[in-house]
Curated annotation (Swiss-Prot):
<dbReference type="InterPro" id="IPR020598">
    <property type="entry name" value="rRNA_Ade_methylase_Trfase_N"/>
</dbReference>
<keyword id="KW-0949">S-adenosyl-L-methionine</keyword>
<keyword id="KW-0808">Transferase</keyword>
<dbReference type="InterPro" id="IPR029063">
    <property type="entry name" value="SAM-dependent_MTases_sf"/>
</dbReference>
<comment type="similarity">
    <text>Belongs to the class I-like SAM-binding methyltransferase superfamily. rRNA adenine N(6)-methyltransferase family. RsmA subfamily.</text>
</comment>
<dbReference type="GO" id="GO:0052908">
    <property type="term" value="F:16S rRNA (adenine(1518)-N(6)/adenine(1519)-N(6))-dimethyltransferase activity"/>
</dbReference>
<keyword id="KW-0489">Methyltransferase</keyword>
<feature type="binding site">
    <location>
        <position position="29"/>
    </location>
    <ligand>
        <name>S-adenosyl-L-methionine</name>
    </ligand>
</feature>
<comment type="function">
    <text>Specifically dimethylates two adjacent adenosines (A1518 and A1519) in the loop of a conserved hairpin near the 3'-end of 16S rRNA in the 30S particle. May play a critical role in biogenesis of 30S subunits.</text>
</comment>
<feature type="binding site">
    <location>
        <position position="130"/>
    </location>
    <ligand>
        <name>S-adenosyl-L-methionine</name>
    </ligand>
</feature>
<dbReference type="Pfam" id="PF00398">
    <property type="entry name" value="RrnaAD"/>
</dbReference>
<dbReference type="InterPro" id="IPR011530">
    <property type="entry name" value="rRNA_adenine_dimethylase"/>
</dbReference>
<dbReference type="InterPro" id="IPR020596">
    <property type="entry name" value="rRNA_Ade_Mease_Trfase_CS"/>
</dbReference>
<dbReference type="InterPro" id="IPR001737">
    <property type="entry name" value="KsgA/Erm"/>
</dbReference>
<dbReference type="GO" id="GO:0003723">
    <property type="term" value="F:RNA binding"/>
</dbReference>
<feature type="binding site">
    <location>
        <position position="100"/>
    </location>
    <ligand>
        <name>S-adenosyl-L-methionine</name>
    </ligand>
</feature>
<feature type="binding site">
    <location>
        <position position="27"/>
    </location>
    <ligand>
        <name>S-adenosyl-L-methionine</name>
    </ligand>
</feature>
Amino acid sequence: MNLWSPTTLKEILARHNLTLSHGLGQHFLTDFGILAKIVEKAEITKDDAVLEIGPGAGVLTRLLAQAAKYVVAIEIDKKLLPVLAETTGDLGNVVVVNADAREINFDRVMAEQTGGEFGFEGKPYLIVANLPYYATSPLIFKVFEEGYKVSSMTLMMQKEVAERITAKPGSKIYGSLSVACQYFSEPRIVLKVPRTVFFPPPEVESAVVRFTLKENSLTSEERLKFFQIVRAAFATRRKTIAKSLSGALNLKRNYVEEVLLKVGIKPDLRAEQIPPESFYRLSQEVVGGKW
């Protein structure tokens, strides 16, 4: 089944009386070379389980199924389920789950669909996805905030978001997403993708980012505090870190400055000048004492 042909895709969608939803960010990748590159960059083995978010018509899904032991595909659009049944129904290692990926527990779903082999107390799994642009940041934050048992992510996204994720301290586009991604993983842009290889073409250029997740033992409380501090710090970018934190968290300025100095952060710096590791040290000081 030549799913990477726009003509074939149009025929399948027409057969099911479907039109693509702009609101759900439905843009199907139809270039076989780029699809194969995504699978290659994901470094999938026959012992791996892959969580795919937004399989669409199953174009990438079929290639993932060739490389992995299991593929669990999460699709929000009920109208696409008959399409996926047609395009992936012959694959014995693919399960399609109709759900909003922003609202489900990834570890639980993976454990349920792999007989407990992956997720929770099982082995780590991979995430590979051509993400809907509107959900990119929420889904990435979700993985890091929840501490899911994910070893790597290979994600197609808007090029602008990819550049924010990999931006370094001091850059105008370095922000809370940069801090989260670079503290919990090692993100790299591994592929740039033109808009012309999608059906229908989006209005922006895309890029594929490969995230290699770092091992850490943060508790739920520590993760919560880390993200609370990072978001508060970037809430008012033009202010100093001391002003931002004292204002957003309703704390006395002199107390905030004292804590910042204790962990080696100058109170007159702005959030965009502070590396991820410094935010971690700050969150640890807060967890260990009073905030």
